[in-house]
């Protein structure tokens, strides 16, 4: 009997049964074939089921892919949010960002998001759906930025919402370029630079802020 992967077990636990199998196949096809070539037939071939099941359970290939993106995003939030909330300094946050980036690459999350963004460029409704799924990340970063700059010289100059959006956009851009280029060395070098520079920026912030916790 073929041994199932950990990711398959996690998806099935989250969604259950046939839906889980479809989502897992949709994600695998998206990673292997790209958005443009991820059709109902390709997903069904990957998962070994009738393509009619995709439309029965999700209504469209696009909805199945969005369900996969939902699963990936929610899983990442559950995995990273506790560490993000516990980080109290810029060096800790910079190190965490580097760790998240490496895990995203290893698990193929960069490819999933990158391909969905690519699809959203030519489909405005899909684009809106993808952007909406970034909102929890923007809110999480916004809360942290607000806490970090509280009481500092930066507080009146740094709108937390705008800064959070810029940080997410920068991270997404790094992910996308790494995916397109196939070379993660430059992205990792940039993240390593962030780790080295973070202590310098930290010196400009209040030494203690109870709101950071």
Describe the role of every protein-language-model region:
Residues 67, 78-110, 160-167:
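Hydrophobic alpha-helical connector segments
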Residues 21, 25-32, 79-83, 112, ...:
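Solvent-exposed, amphipathic alpha-helical segments
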Residues 70-75:
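Short, basic, alpha-helical segments at the C-terminal edge of helix-turn-helix-like DNA-binding modules
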Residues 21, 25-63, 67:
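Helix-turn-helix
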Residues 125-131, 135, 149-213:
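Hydrophobic/aromatic-rich alpha-helical bundle segments in the mid-to-C-terminal region
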């Amino acid at each position: 009997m073929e041994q199932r992967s950990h990711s398959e077990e996690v998806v099935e636990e989250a969604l259950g049964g046939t839906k889980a199998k479809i989502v897992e196949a949709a994600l695998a096809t998206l990673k292997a074939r790209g958005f443009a070539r991820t059709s109902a037939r390709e997903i069904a071939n990957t998962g070994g089921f009738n393509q009619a099941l995709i439309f029965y359970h999700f209504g469209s290939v696009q909805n199945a892919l969005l369900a996969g993106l939902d699963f990936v995003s929610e899983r990442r939030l559950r995995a990273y949010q506790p560490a993000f909330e516990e980080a109290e300094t810029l060096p800790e946050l910079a190190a965490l960002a580097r760790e998240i980036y490496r895990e995203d690459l290893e698990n193929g999350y960069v490819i999933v998001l990158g391909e969905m963004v690519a699809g959203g460029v030519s489909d405005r409704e899909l684009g809106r759906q993808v952007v909406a799924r970034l909102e929890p990340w923007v809110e999480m970063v916004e809360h942290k930025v607000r806490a970090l700059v509280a009481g500092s010289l930066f507080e009146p100059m740094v709108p937390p919402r705008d800064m959070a959006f810029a940080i997410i956009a920068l991270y997404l851009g790094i992910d996308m370029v790494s995916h397109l280029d196939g070379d993660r060395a430059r992205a990792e070098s940039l993240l390593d630079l962030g780790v080295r520079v973070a202590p310098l920026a930290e010196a400009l912030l209040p030494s203690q802020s109870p709101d950071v916790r």
